[in-house]
Regions:
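Glycine-rich loop/linker segments at domain edges
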Residues: 2-8, 120, 129-134, 185-234, ...
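Thiamine diphosphate
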Residues: 91, 96, 397, 416-441, ...
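N-terminal export signals
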Residues: 2, 19, 25-47
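Flexible, low-hydrophobicity surface segments
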Residues: 2-5, 49-55, 99-101, 106-334, ...
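N-terminal secretory signal peptides
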Residues: 1-21
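Conserved beta-alpha junction segments in alpha/beta enzyme cores
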Residues: 49-97, 222-223, 229, 234-235, ...
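Short beta-strand elements
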Residues: 66-72, 223, 229, 373-378, ...
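C-terminal catalytic domains of large/alpha subunits in multi-subunit enzymes
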Residues: 99-121, 150-178, 265-267, 402-411, ...
Length: 712
């Protein structure tokens, strides 16, 4: 269980500029040791990448027990990372898992971020899956290498296998040792393992771990602060030109009627403007403006005039979307029943008290620091796309359809991401870049301005939730009914990922996560509804914590109102429901303890803030508790917000957030803390400040002058 108390906010009324550190002041306090990042693709030697692969591994003999890492004759361990690095330090965490089981010398560990080679399997980074899902695979891969090295090291030392142990990059037998690098250089490492053998590979007990759970400097921090790191927007190749798009008025079904570039011809460096022909339908109605520099492309794009044929979606407003959501919820026969316990109607019919509430959220944009971009070109029969991306496996079929070639003739090279947040799960921006390069037969680097990015964003859909609760004798909760309507990103982009509800209707789990809670509430009904008007009007996207971000907000707000209606303290009310009865007891492999673990974090945070004590005048405490995106994720969290209200102006100021988190095994504590703090502050930002709306089929806010997230 980890406690986080660092989310204290500045008091209102102070000059924001006086509080804001300069970029130089911020960077100058960050220090660390060096690290090498790179891509193992010798065909791209002319491209500016993080660092050349040749700098990473000593020439000559090396040992590669699995596809996930190799060891060279100097003992350097190079770990292949198939997940995207976007500030969460995933490479450090995954390398740490390998190195701990391998007993590698952490000072000799390096990471390579892999391209879209099919050997890596599905490549997706999001949903808090990376460490959770890769831990078993990578830990067993590390253990397999350790056993093979001990076997060969024992032979070289002339001692039995049983007399040897491994520690910190060496095999030790009594007072003698041989380094891993020497074993690689001198030995005959030919041990192989079948997939079934790897699955059965024993790993260390937690008490013997030396790296997992210990503080360490993230491997990507030094290159990010000294300028060596390379993001997608930094990618270059000889002979490339630049392009900026003219984004059509709606996501779908726009067609170009005419292009007038007469004014753009006055811009030095301007080349031409072309309408893209996209068989995939990803970039319908896009016009690409080419120039010899991004500055020229951007200036020219502002002068190019495009006339489109616009579909009916151009008239859709936020109010239309919410009205449609209300109509969907009112129709009791629609949607997918995710949970549908018997006894629901009887519980409400016999209830001593019932309550019903409706909760809505507005459109939320991503606004990643690095606007979307991609460099694309054809070389030696392969079409290469260089960009920061979270889900290469999803984007490759779109690229194949758009380019008219098979997926094995396309490779995506993933760079560091200047913000992911779910935006780069949707690799739609790779398609127009590739089409732009195909159209002119040369490398093209497409860079969107922030406004372009937002017009083409896949925002978090506006949502509506209706919750009902029934109370029986003694205030016992006897039923909970929960309806949630929103645009469904998985339906728009990956419908094969959608399971079926108990009524046989497919649903988007990422638009309902968090509703199937750990509370014991008697009969439970959970209904997920797709706001089809939203899906027709724009492409809904996944955004930081996905469905849980807005679904749990509705559920926990409702729990407060239910506690008030029942006349029970909000913490006590929740603890009463977190009794671990039935399926809420949880179970293996990851959710052992279930509701009791959620009750533990809730009790702990209440204790830390003095929940039952007095607060100053005009200051109150608010509480919420939730769990990981999936019920079987080993994560439970509770948060208390200390809030001050100015009675004269009505201004609400959140003074402090206190979080307690149980996330099971923590590989990198500092990174886990940072992710929790960032999630809490972003949630606060969306609650108090963020939110846009659709006006005439477009998001109203396309830059940070009107879209106002939480400020430093």
């Amino acid at each position: 269980m980890h406690e986080i108390f660092s989310c204290r906010l500045p008091k209102p009324g102070r000059d924001a500029d006086a509080l804001a550190p300069s970029r130089r002041d911020f960077l100058i306090v960050v220090v660390g040791t060096g690290v090498v990042l790179g891509y193992a693709r010798s065909t791209l030697a002319a491209i500016e990448l993080p660092l050349a692969a040749a700098q990473q591994t000593a020439p000559g003999k090396f040992f590669e027990p699995t596809i996930w890492y190799s060891i060279d004759r100097n003992g350097a361990v190079t770990v292949n990372i198939k997940c995207a690095e976007m500030g969460q330090h995933v490479g450090t965490a995954l390398a740490r898992i390998v190195a701990d089981e391998l007993e590698g010398d952490w000072n000799k560990v390096r990471t390579i971020y892999a391209d879209s080679n099919p050997k890596w399997g599905s490549m997706m980074t999001g949903g808090s899956y990376s460490v959770w899902q890769n831990f078993p695979v990578l830990s067993r891969a590390g253990a397999a290498g350790r056993i093979a090295l001990i076997e060969e090291g024992a032979k070289l030392l002339g001692v039995p296998f049983e007399a040897c142990t491994a520690r910190n990059g060496a095999v030790i037998a009594g007072g003698r040792l041989i380094a891993y690098g020497d074993i690689v250089a001198r030995g005959n490492l030919n041990r192989t393992y079948t997939p079934d053998q790897l699955k059965q590979m024993p790993i260390k007990p937690p008490s013997e771990r030396r790296l997992i759970g210990r503080e360490t400097l993230a491997l990507d921090i030094p290159p990010k602060t000294n300028g060596e790191a390379r993001y997608g927007i930094d990618a270059v190749v000889d002979g490339m030109i630049y392009a900026r798009p003219k984004v059509p008025p709606t996501r779908y079904d726009c067609t170009v009627r005419s292009i007038d570039d007469s004014a753009a011809k006055s811009v030095p460096g301007y080349i031409q403007s072309l309408a893209l022909d996209d068989p995939s339908g990803t970039a319908s109605g896009w016009v690409m403006v080419y120039a010899d520099s991004f500055v020229a492309a951007s200036r020219a794009a502002d002068l190019v005039r495009v006339e489109w044929s616009v579909p009916g979606a151009a008239q859709v407003s936020e109010q239309d979307l919410q009205r449609h959501a209300a109509q969907l919820i009112a129709d009791k026969n629609g949607g997918a029943l995710v949970v549908d316990d018997p006894g629901m109607e009887a519980a409400f019919a016999a209830a001593k008290l019932t309550i019903e509430r409706t909760y809505t959220t507005s459109t939320v944009m991503h606004f990643a620091l690095e606007p979307v971009n991609a460099l694309a070109f054809e070389k030696n029969g392969m079409f290469e796309v260089h960009t920061g991306n979270q889900w290469q496996t999803l984007a490759l079929p779109w690229l194949a359809k758009a380019l008219g070639r098979s997926e094995d003739k396309i490779v995506m090279v993933t760079y560091l991401l200047g913000g992911g947040f779910g935006r780069r799960l949707d690799g739609d921006y790779a398609v127009p870049a590739a089409l732009a390069a195909k159209a002119v037969g040369k490398p093209v680097k497409m860079v969107c301005t922030r406004s372009d990015d937002m017009r083409f964003d896949c925002p978090r859909s506006p949502s509506m939730q209706v919750l009902r609760m029934a109370f029986g004798e003694g205030g016992k909760v006897t039923a909970l009914e929960h309806h949630a309507a929103a645009g469904w990103p998985t339906l728009a982009m990956a419908p094969s990922f959608m399971p079926k509800g108990v009524n046989g209707v497919p649903f988007d789990p990422y638009a309902i996560h968090g509703a199937d809670c750990w509370y014991t509430v008697g009969a439970q009904r959970l209904r997920a509804l797709c706001n089809d008007l939203a899906n027709r009007s724009f492409r809904p996207g996944w955004l930081r914590s996905v469905g849980s971000g807005w679904v749990n907000w509705g559920l926990e707000s409702f729990m407060d109102e239910a506690a008030h209606a029942a006349g029970v303290d909000p913490v006590a009310f929740r603890l009463r429901l977190l009794d671990g009865a039935g399926r809420n007891a949880g179970g293996p492999p990851s959710a052992i303890g279930g509701a009791h673990r959620q009750a533990a974090v809730l009790s702990r945070v209440a204790q830390k803030v003095g929940w039952s004590g007095d607060t100053p005048k005009d200051v109150g405490l608010g509480v919420a508790t939730t769990f990981g995106q999936e019920r079987d994720m080993p994560t439970w969290v509770a948060c208390v917000a200390r809030v001050r209200v100015d009675r004269a102006s009505g201004r609400v100021t959140v003074e402090k957030l206190t979080l307690v988190v149980d996330a099971g095994t923590i590989v990198c504590p500092d990174s886990a803390r940072a992710q929790n703090e960032g999630a809490a502050l972003w949630g606060l930002s969306m609650a108090l400040h963020e939110g846009s709306e659709f006006v005439n089929g477009q998001p109203k806010d396309t830059n940070l002058d009107t879209y106002t997230p939480l400020r430093m």
